[in-house]
Amino acid sequence: MPKKQQHYKTIVLSDIHLGSKWSKTKEVTHFLKQHSCDTLILCGDIIDGWSLMRGKNSKWRRRHTNFIKVLLDISHDTKIIYVRGNHDDFLDRVIPLTFSNISVVKDYIYTSGDKRYYVLHGDVFDKVTSSMSWLAKVGDVGYSFLLWANKIYNRRRLKKGLPYYSIAREIKLKVKASVSYISDFEKHIVDIAGKKGCQGVICGHIHYPEKKMIGNVLYLNSGDWMESLSALTEDYDGNWNVYIEEKALTEVRDSESETVSHTELAV
């Protein structure tokens, strides 16, 4: 395994959607091989059971197995907390479950220093809203088309030496309905965390990485590995950052050695 480039106290990943043809599995596997941590939080939708059940172009591939192997390998030195999401809700049959250094749970309270963070995927929001936006429907035809367009667009950008660019993120920033959905989601999730007596909340679900204060609660969203290629990282001083890959490996060539640049957004 390649030498680690960076070590963190905590890393949070979510919405990898193993089994979906849109999953950037090689990128996230590369990320885990290049970054280590004491605690790895997998914040839901790691495995896309919905896509696997639908079949068609979605199926379990060797690269998905390789990702699981990397998880098992790093679990010898890293505590792994797997919080189930809506696309891997098949885990409801077995949770809570602990084996070796891996725990599979519905939700989790993560304590760092004197702060408590409520960890959940975020699909609980779907149960209280009647406006089921395409943002929450990974299998939706419109969203699939957007991911296809994103792939074609970035393939051309990368041939020109330009960094990865998420079309979906730009749309979410400009479309009123999307902005409203994200805002309502954030407020609801923060409210839940506050009622749990937590100073922060860690979630995923909406494929929109973010770090910001909402009232007295620190809102942290790890984004996804279908379009955003993002994660959350925490250093030993308790500082959180949004990590975003700037290049998609599979858009250039099928290689583990491809250099991947990134940015860390300290908001």
Language-model features and meaning:
Residues K9-H17, L52-K56, E170-A177:
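Short, basic, glycine/proline-bearing loop/turn elements
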Residues E251-V267:
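C-terminal regulatory/interaction regions
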Residues I11, I41, I81-V83, Y118, ...:
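Hydrophobic/aromatic beta-strand patches that form the interior of the parallel beta-sheet core
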Residues D15, D45, G85, H121, ...:
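Active-site glycine-centered loops adjacent to acidic/histidine catalytic or metal-binding residues
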Residues G122-F185:
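Active-site-proximal loop/helix segment associated with metal-binding centers of metalloenzymes
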